[in-house]
């Protein structure tokens, strides 16, 4: 059986005249206007629901019109381009809201050109899962990065085997720690889990245990690079699975995501 390979065109300024094909993202309905409406809309754009809604719209459109239809391909590239543009703004203008990044006027989202405007760095915000897909489709395998401080890691020393084993062994004193461990980001962060999933980390620090059993760990965590692909997985979550279905429809190249930087962890407890 012959396999059909579909290449989605990258977002560019050469768009057809049907209104650019951008879907409208809809926050939960709030009667009337005023501060409450603004709060709801801004909160929606900061939430994973914004990313999931966009992916659902894309999947629904493809089901109705087919993955190889030229109009479908342009609509896919246009909507992904809006997210690339927003993520770019989040990187270039730290501290702005996702809503403002998505609606930034200069350049207008409809003028986003992946070939000239794509960035190595990703923001780590709710826009990033779709941007990670864009790099798979059009990035030609070039490595990307997201700062480890921006991916919302939650690390407990008691979930790190070497630290847990020392604490439970009954010893007392101060112990240097240097160990690698696997961490499932999708267990608590649907956005990070969608494009990183399980990652390999390394912690270095000092564990101090007192005679009464109280302990304190003070250290840093760094990450090894992660490969972005669509291999079989059980830890991607609802957004990650939607990305997997979309990625399977089109040709792309897997690539490395670098996670530069470090985060500090300090926790105390009693065995």
From Swiss-Prot:
Residue numbers covered by motif TonB box: 2-9
GO BP term (any one): killing of cells of another organism
RNA-binding is among the record's keywords: no
Swiss-Prot/TrEMBL keywords: Antibiotic, Antimicrobial, Bacteriocin, Plasmid, TonB box
More info: This colicin requires TonB for its uptake.
Signal sequence, start to end: none
Protein name: Colicin-M
Entry function: Colicins are polypeptide toxins produced by and active against E.coli and closely related bacteria.
Coiled coil: none
Recorded name of the encoding gene: cma
Organism, as annotated: Escherichia coli
InterPro entries in the cross-refs: Colicin_M
């Amino acid at each position: 059986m012959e396999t059909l390979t579909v290449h989605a065109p990258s977002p560019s300024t050469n768009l057809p005249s049907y209104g650019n094909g951008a879907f409208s993202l809809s926050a939960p309905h709030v009667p009337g206007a005023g501060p409450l409406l603004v709060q709801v809309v801004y909160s929606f754009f900061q939430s994973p629901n914004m990313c999931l809604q966009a992916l659902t719209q894309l999947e629904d459109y493809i089901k109705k019109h087919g993955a190889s239809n030229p109009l479908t391909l342009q609509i896919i590239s246009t909507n992904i381009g809006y997210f690339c543009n927003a993520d770019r703004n989040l990187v270039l203008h730290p501290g702005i809201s996702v809503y403002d990044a998505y609606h930034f006027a200069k350049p207008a989202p409809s003028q986003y050109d992946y070939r000239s405007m794509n960035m190595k760095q990703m923001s780590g915000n709710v826009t990033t899962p779709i941007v990670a897909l864009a790099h798979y489709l059009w990035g030609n395998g070039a490595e990307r990065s997201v700062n480890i401080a921006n991916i919302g890691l939650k690390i407990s020393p008691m979930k790190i085997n070497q630290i847990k084993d020392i604490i439970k062994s009954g010893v007392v004193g101060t112990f240097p720690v240097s160990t690698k461990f696997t961490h499932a980001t999708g267990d608590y962060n649907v956005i990070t889990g969608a494009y990183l999933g399980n990652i390999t980390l390394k912690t270095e620090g000092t564990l101090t245990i007192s005679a009464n059993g109280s302990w304190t760990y003070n250290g840093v965590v760094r990450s090894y690079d992660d490969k972005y692909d669509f291999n079989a997985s059980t830890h991607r979550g609802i957004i990650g699975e939607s990305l997997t279905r979309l990625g399977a429809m089109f040709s792309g190249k897997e690539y490395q995501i670098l996670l530069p930087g470090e985060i500090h962890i300090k926790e105390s407890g009693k065995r």
